[in-house]
């Protein structure tokens, strides 16, 4: 029997400034039976107590959802029709502890254990980049070590920040130490700016990561690069983590730690669309800080990139 697939609420059914502010105005579901019926789900993690400069990413999930009213169900560029083949909903936010980072990390891992237990592929609205560590911890229990496509201005491989081992800049150092990643299947794209030492990006390379600095991406299409990325990370489950500061602040000023000389919005779409065919088992879009962009454009960009992630999930049909 065909599944009853949830559909976004369209702008001709309800004005875009009305309706319930879920992602794409999809149904909000929470009961165990409803969760069991989902293939993928949008979930918010409104955390910003792991940031080292600007706060405000706690408001990211809410504003990304608000801007997502502009997104329509069919991808006219790629032909992807995610709502024709996947059952997708918004399952709300993780109730983090906003006063205790380590407790928040524990709660996130526990909640993703539950989400993955329902067979749901999570599309996460951040929140700062600390959240990816507990998500990867939960994912390892279900999928084992995973490959990673990581877009960011920063490598996030600090050993510590002010003596703390858990923060938004230590995520992938901890992930390596905890054996969460298949290091020969990891690519970091968009790294740039200055370092505290001349070797700051080399730690990643020494682990087996492919590091693509932003300068290698300037003035060109990234479609050829993504062919190489698919070759590098394919052959197993892959997680996609996209820090909005990977994009130049001319397009994405609303973020925690902006760096000039970044990727364009077009390159961002090329990267995500270039993940088509990979065995994606989860994605996140992190570090949107709405208070630093009153136009809403950074949140709108985040919403569109999450939609593009949905469009490249396994099982999505094309029209």
Regions found by a protein language model. Give the residues of each.
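Conserved alpha-helical scaffold segments that buttress catalytic/binding sites
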Residues: 2-319
């Amino acid at each position: 029997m065909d599944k009853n697939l949830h559909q976004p609420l369209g702008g001709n059914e309800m004005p875009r400034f009305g309706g319930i502010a879920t992602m794409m105005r999809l149904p909000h579901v929470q009961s165990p039976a409803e969760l069991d019926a989902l293939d993928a789900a949008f979930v918010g993690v409104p955390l910003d107590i792991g940031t080292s400069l600007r706060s405000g990413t706690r408001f990211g999930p809410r504003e990304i959802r608000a801007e997502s009213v502009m997104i329509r169900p069919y991808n006219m560029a790629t032909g992807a029709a995610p709502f024709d083949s996947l059952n997708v909903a918004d399952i709300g936010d993780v109730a983090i502890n906003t006063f205790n980072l380590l407790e928040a990390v524990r709660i996130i891992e526990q909640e993703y254990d539950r989400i993955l237990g329902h067979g749901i592929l999570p599309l996460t609205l951040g929140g700062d980049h600390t959240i990816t560590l507990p998500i990867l911890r939960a994912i390892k229990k279900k999928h084992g070590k995973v490959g990673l496509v990581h877009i960011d201005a920063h490598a996030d491989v600090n050993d510590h920040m002010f003596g703390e081992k858990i923060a938004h800049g230590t995520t992938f150092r901890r992930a390596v130490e905890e054996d969460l990643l298949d290091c020969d299947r990891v690519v970091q794209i968009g790294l740039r700016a200055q370092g505290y030492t001349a070797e700051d990006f080399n730690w990643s390379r020494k682990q087996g990561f492919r590091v693509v600095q932003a300068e290698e991406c300037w003035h060109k299409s990234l479609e050829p690069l993504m062919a190489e990325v698919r070759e590098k990370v394919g052959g197993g489950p892959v997680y996609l983590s996209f820090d909005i500061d990977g994009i130049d602040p001319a397009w994405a000023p609303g973020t925690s730690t902006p760096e000039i000389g970044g990727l364009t919005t077009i390159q961002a779409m090329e990267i995500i669309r270039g993940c088509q065919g990979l065995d994606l088992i989860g994605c996140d879009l992190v570090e949107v800080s709405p208070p630093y962009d009153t136009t809403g454009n950074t949140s709108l960009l985040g919403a569109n990139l999450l939609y593009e992630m949905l469009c490249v999930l396994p099982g999505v049909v094309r029209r």
